[in-house]
């Protein structure tokens, strides 16, 4: 028996979410080692550990809700795909602009200059704009009308805390 269209959509969403996430994790880990070897400093109040659970957990919860909720209108799935893909482009543009400085953790190497190219010319934190867009897109694609907003609120709070930590660390490095 062939899997339903809904099952195939959810499988495609899972691949769209978790394959790039794995690639990003490998790149971030490699860059973290490089940054620390160059004398990088991590602030003690970073929320990385919680984010590293909440981020994939949010997508997983949305996929489970989507499986339980059933098929979504194709137009909503398509809109979610467009939002997700656009967000991924913004995020990857930020990753490319940061180069070897991009990590999952806040690591500041004393003496490094602030990146002001790519999307950083227009946005202070384009990577996080991309992350929020990924969550919105996934919520639309899966029909996660409960876990989507909950994930956005919860992860939004974590991002707010993370940005504060990052700003303090960057300000301290420029002194």
Q: Could you tell me what each predicted segment is?
A:
Residues 15-19, 53, 57, 82:
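Hydrophobic alpha-helical topogenic segments used for membrane insertion/localization
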Residues 3-11:
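N-terminal membrane topogenic signal
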Residues 1-4, 45-76:
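Long, highly hydrophobic alpha-helical transmembrane signal-anchor segments
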Residues 26-47, 70-175:
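Cytosolic-biased juxtamembrane loops and peripheral soluble domains of multi-pass membrane proteins
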């Amino acid at each position: 028996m062939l899997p339903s269209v809904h099952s195939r959509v959810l499988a495609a969403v899972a691949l769209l979410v978790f394959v790039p996430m794995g690639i990003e994790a490998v790149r971030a880990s490699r860059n973290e080692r490089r940054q620390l070897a160059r004398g990088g400093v991590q602030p003690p109040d970073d929320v990385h550990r919680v984010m590293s659970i909440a981020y994939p957990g949010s997508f997983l919860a949305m996929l489970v809700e989507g499986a339980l909720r059933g098929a979504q209108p194709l137009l909503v799935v398509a809109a979610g795909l467009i939002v997700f893909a656009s967000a991924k482009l913004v995020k990857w543009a930020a990753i490319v602009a940061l180069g070897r400085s991009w990590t999952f953790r806040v690591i500041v190497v004393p003496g490094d200059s602030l990146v002001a190219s790519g999307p950083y010319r227009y946005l202070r934190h384009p990577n996080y704009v991309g992350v929020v867009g990924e969550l919105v897109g996934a919520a639309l694609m899966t029909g996660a009308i409960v876990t989507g907003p909950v994930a956005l609120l919860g992860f939004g709070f974590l991002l707010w805390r993370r940005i504060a930590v990052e700003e303090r660390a960057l300000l301290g490095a420029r002194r």
